[in-house]
Amino acid sequence: ECQRIVLAAGLANAELAPMVGLQQSLKPQKGQIIVTEKLDQQMALPSLLLRQTDEGGLMIGDSHEDTGFETSVRPNIVSGIADRALATLPALADVGVVRSWAALRVMSKDGYPIYDQSEAMPGAFAISCHSGVTLSAAHAFDLAGYIAEASLGQELDRFSQRRFNV
């Protein structure tokens, strides 16, 4: 027996949440990225298109595709990402690409996270969002504290699945 259980299983939360009395309306959205070789110079600020890793490589990507659960890399999409990156930062023309890949984002109907606590099982929570990169600090600090205290708090009500029940 445990006092808390957190469902944070990505798209599988749609199937798992009903087991604890919750609903998570989720759909997949494919995104593709390019990763460059490591760069000595650090970018001052991330953008919506470019982010630099601690190791120095750039993660470049801004694609949004509705392909169901299909995750193959499409050269025309990767080429478009590269073209937009070069238009934004022409110095990238001399930077090598190390790899590219596609993955699925976990999307709610409105694109915002879903944070819910079960009324049927008060220690059970379901957490779904599309960006571990931008929301990871909130999840690691703020959200973890709410879960530890067994209450998400009224300020997170706007992120409940209930917002779709109108």
Question: PLM features: residue spans?
Answer:
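Central helical "cap/lid" subdomain
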Residues: 2-42
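Mid-domain beta-loop-alpha active-site segment that forms a flexible
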Residues: 10-12, 77-84, 128-129, 133-135, ...
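Short glycine-/acidic-enriched loop or helix-start segments at secondary-structure transitions
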Residues: 16-18, 45, 69-71, 136-137
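C-terminal catalytic lobe of FAD-dependent flavoproteins
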Residues: 89-166
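Active-site lid/adjacent beta-loop-alpha segment flanking the redox-cofactor pocket in flavoenzymes
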Residues: 37-121
